[in-house]
Amino acid sequence: MAEDDKVFRRARERLVERLKSLGYIRSNRVAEAMLKVPRHEFVPEDLRDRAYVDSPLPIGRGQTISAPHMVAIMTELLDPRPGHKVLEVGAGSGYHAAVVAELVKPDGRVITVERIPELADFARNNLKKTGYDRFVKVLVGDGTKGYPPEAPYDRILVTAGAPDVPESLLEQLKPGGKMVIPVGDRHMQELWLVEKTEDGEIRRRRHGGCAFVPLIGEEGFQEPES
């Protein structure tokens, strides 16, 4: 293992231990996934030395990679299992999709929809160099409408703040499935766990405040005027 890799590995171990001690990581499965995925491979080159600081980082086009504690919270709530098919709305750098892929592989997979083509390319490259492209498919499009060709999904993860839960995503969620989504305004939201019962009833639970970039799309916020 190269010296840089050892340094990053130790930093990743310290971060995961801290997230466990603070209660953000509650399961061994999520701890192992976050230990395995090299976050420094999913941030811009000039920010690699900050990859294991618990804060969001800019990835271009006004978008960010979420803080590790928020990735842990959302992944614990989502509870992806081996064999699950997961839809992610907002690929960003591809990091969160890689963490989820660790939890659903070898037979599960992640479909992630990104509206910004340059970020979709960034995510694809990051996933390819880390080997997660075998389990993650990156698409360009309006994620608020989901991706009907692969529906229904066991789990849906939304990584941007929505004004409400998009109806298309509810329709594409399997009975018995779970969705994690930030709901609120363009700046501050609450993190919701949305569950669809086996008979199709929708249940929502709130899990505290958060701050995500706005979810832009037909069933989200409109693109701000320039």
Swiss-Prot record:
Active site: 66
Catalytic activity: [protein]-L-isoaspartate + S-adenosyl-L-methionine = [protein]-L-isoaspartate alpha-methyl ester + S-adenosyl-L-homocysteine
Domain of life, source organism: Archaea
Gene Ontology molecular function terms on file: protein-L-isoaspartate (D-aspartate) O-methyltransferase activity
Protein name listed in UniProt: Protein-L-isoaspartate O-methyltransferase
Keywords per UniProt: Cytoplasm, Methyltransferase, S-adenosyl-L-methionine, Transferase
Family indicated by similarity: Belongs to the methyltransferase superfamily. L-isoaspartyl/D-aspartyl protein methyltransferase family.
Entry-linked PROSITE patterns: PCMT (PS01279)
EC assignment: 2.1.1.77
